A protein has these predicted regions:
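Conserved "HGTGT" condensation-loop signature of ketosynthase/thiolase-family condensing enzymes
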Residues: 1-229, 236-242, 251-364, 371-476
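Short, solvent-exposed loop/turn segments at conserved positions within beta-propeller repeat blades
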Residues: 245-247
C-alpha cells in the first residue's frame, strides 16, 4: 500500500558504559606512568617527593588517563547516540505515517438518493428481492425529465434543497469549499447551472467551488483533507444524458473538521478518512496493512464495499478478509461484502462518491466501520468510514537520549588544555578576573556545545543509511 506502515526494524540498545573499563584504564595508566618514571629516572635514583619533579609527570599521567577515558566515553556515546537516533527515527516515521493516514473529516450530514429506492433495505435483508423486470433508471419519477444540463440543474436543485437546512443549522455563514463531480462532460454549462441554483437561495457562505471530471480519481480527495479546516460540501451525481442507460444517483455530504465540533458532538459521528493507495494484485497484504493502520477498532464488525476490481481480487475479497480475521456483518450483503457493481451498476471513477454516499446511508442500519475498495483504469484506492477516532501514537513513549559523558569529558580536557596554554603564554590574564570569566564562559559554551555538535554530526552521517533502509522496507 502506498501509505502502508513502515517496517524499519529498530536496533537493540547498546550496553551501558562500564566502570570496570574505566578502572582498568586508570590502573593501566598508573602502571604505565610508573614504568616510564623508572625508565627515565636519573642514575642517582628516583627524585624525592619534595623536589617537585613528580608534579608535572603526575599531571601528564592523569591527563593521559583522562584522555583515554574521554575517548572511550565518546566512542560509547557515539554508539548509543546512533542507536537512539535510529529508534527515534523509526518511531517518528511510524507516527508520521499514522498521523497522515488518520486524517479525516466528520460527516455532519448527508443525502443519498438512488434510482433503486429499495437498494439498501435489500442489502440488509429487511426487504425481499422483488425487483421489477424493468429496472428504475431515474430519480424523481413524478417530475418531467429532459436529458442533459436541464436534468443536472433539476437534480442539483433537489439535492441542495435536501442538504442546505442541516448546513445552515451547523454552519450558518463563513467560507465553504464545494466539490462537484458528475458524469457530464460539459463542465462550463454545469458551472453556469450550479451558480444559478446556488445563488437562488444559498448566499450566506463564501464559496470555493471545484468541478471535477468524472474520470478523476477518488485519491484527489486527500488534498481537501490536508489543505484547510474549511467545511466541505461534496455533491456527486450521475444524471440522465442522451443515449444513457445507467441509473441515476445523487449524493451530498457535508463534512467539517474535527476542531469545529466539541468533544461530545464528535464522539460517535461518522468519519471519512483519507483515501489510501491500493495494490489489488497483493490484496491480502494491502488489507492487512489497512487493518494495521487502526483507522477503525479491530474488534468491531466491518462492512466492505468494492467496485471496479478485476475478477481475481473481486472473487477473493471474502476469503482474504476471513484469513485476516476481520469481523464482518454476515447478515448484510454477501457475508459482509457488497459488490457495488453487481447490486447497483458500475460508475467507474464516480463509483467512489456513490459508494461513500451509500455507506454513509448504510450507517443508519448499524454498520459504522466500513471499508470501500475502488479500482479505476490507472490506480486503486481504499477508503475507510468509522464512527470512532483512531488511536494515534499508541507505541509512542519518551526515551531519553544517552548521557553525553564523553562530550563532557572532552569539554573538560579542551578547557584544561586551553587554560594551560593561557597560563604559559598569558599568565597575567589567566590569573585575573577576566581570565577566570573567560574560562567559565568557555565551559558554559563547550559543555552543551560539544554534545550538540557530536549528535548533529552523528545524525548527519547516519541519516543516509536510515533513508536507504526506509526505501527498502516496502515503501513505494
Amino acid at each position: 500500500m502506498g501509505w502502508s506502515l513502515p517496517k524499519i526494524p529498530e536496533k537493540e540498545m547498546v550496553s551501558s558504559w562500564s566502570p570496570w573499563v574505566c578502572l582498568f584504564i586508570i590502573i593501566l595508566g598508573l602502571f604505565t606512568g610508573l614504568i616510564v618514571a623508572v625508565l627515565k629516572s636519573p642514575a642517582a635514583g628516583l627524585p624525592s617527593l619534595s623536589s617537585g619533579a613528580w608534579l608535572p609527570f603526575t599531571a601528564w599521567t592523569f591527563a593521559g588517563i583522562s584522555a583515554v577515558i574521554a575517548v572511550y566515553s565518546t566512542w560509547w556515546e557515539i554508539l548509543a547516540t546512533r542507536v537512539w537516533n535510529w529508534n527515534e527515527w523509526c518511531r517518528s516515521t511510524r507516527l508520521k505515517w499514522c498521523l497522515g493516514a488518520h486524517q479525516y473529516l466528520i460527516i455532519h450530514s448527508h443525502v443519498f438518493i438512488a434510482a433503486d429506492t429499495g437498494l439498501l433495505s435489500r442489502l440488509v435483508h429487511t426487504q425481499e428481492e422483488d425487483r421489477a423486470d424493468t429496472a428504475v433508471l431515474t430519480l424523481l419519477p413524478g417530475e418531467s425529465l429532459t436529458p442533459g444540463i436541464s436534468r443536472f440543474e433539476q437534480l442539483l436543485s433537489h439535492l441542495i434543497a435536501q442538504i442546505i437546512p442541516s448546513i445552515r443549522l451547523r454552519y450558518p455563514s463563513g467560507p465553504l469549499r464545494i466539490i462537484v463531480q458528475t458524469s457530464g462532460r460539459d463542465k462550463e454549462s454545469e458551472s453556469h447551472a450550479f451558480h444559478r441554483v446556488w445563488s437562488a437561495g444559498s448566499s450566506s457562505w463564501i464559496v470555493e467551488i471545484h468541478f471535477q471530471d468524472a474520470d478523476l480519481s477518488i485519491g484527489c480527495w486527500n488534498q481537501f483533507i490536508e489543505s484547510t479546516k474549511w467545511p466541505v460540501l461534496v455533491l456527486a451525481l450521475h444524471y440522465r444524458l442522451p443515449d444513457d442507460v445507467l441509473p441515476e444517483f445523487a449524493t451530498a455530504l457535508f463534512m467539517v473538521h474535527p476542531s469545529m465540533l466539541n468533544q461530545s458532538e464528535g464522539k460517535n459521528t461518522l468519519r471519512l478518512f483519507r483515501a489510501m493507495p491500493l495494490n489489488t494484485r497483493t490484496l491480502a497484504t494491502e488489507l492487512s496493512e489497512l487493518r494495521d493502520m487502526a483507522l477503525t477498532p479491530a474488534s468491531r464488525k466491518h462492512l466492505v464495499w468494492h467496485s471496479g476490481l478485476p475478477d481475481a481480487p473481486r472473487q477473493s475479497v471474502s476469503r482474504v478478509l476471513n484469513e485476516l480475521s476481520v469481523p464482518l456483518y454476515d447478515d448484510i450483503g454477501t457475508g459482509g461484502v457488497i459488490d457495488y457493481d453487481r447490486v447497483c451498476v458500475r460508475y467507474d471513477r464516480l463509483a467512489g462518491w456513490a459508494m461513500i454516499g451509500a455507506a454513509a446511508e448504510m450507517a443508519a442500519y448499524g454498520p459504522a466501520c466500513q471499508w470501500l475498495l475502488l479500482e479505476g483504469k490507472d490506480d486503486a484506492w481504499a477508503v475507510t468510514l468509522g464512527n470512532a477516532a483512531p488511536a494515534v501514537g499508541s507505541d509512542r513513549f519518551v526515551i531519553p537520549p544517552p548521557f553525553p559523558g564523553g562530550s563532557v569529558l572532552m569539554a573538560l580536557l579542551l578547557n584544561a588544555g586551553l587554560y594551560s596554554l593561557m597560563i604559559s603564554y598569558f599568565p597575567s590574564t589567566a590569573f585575573s578576573w577576566s581570565g577566570i570569566a573567560l574560562l567559565l564562559l568557555s565551559l558554559i559554551v563547550t559543555f552543551p556545545g560539544l554534545a550538540i555538535l557530536l549528535r548533529r554530526i552523528t545524525a548527519r552521517l547516519q541519516r543516509p543509511e536510515f533513508i536507504r533502509a526506509a526505501r527498502h522496507s516496502g515503501k513505494e
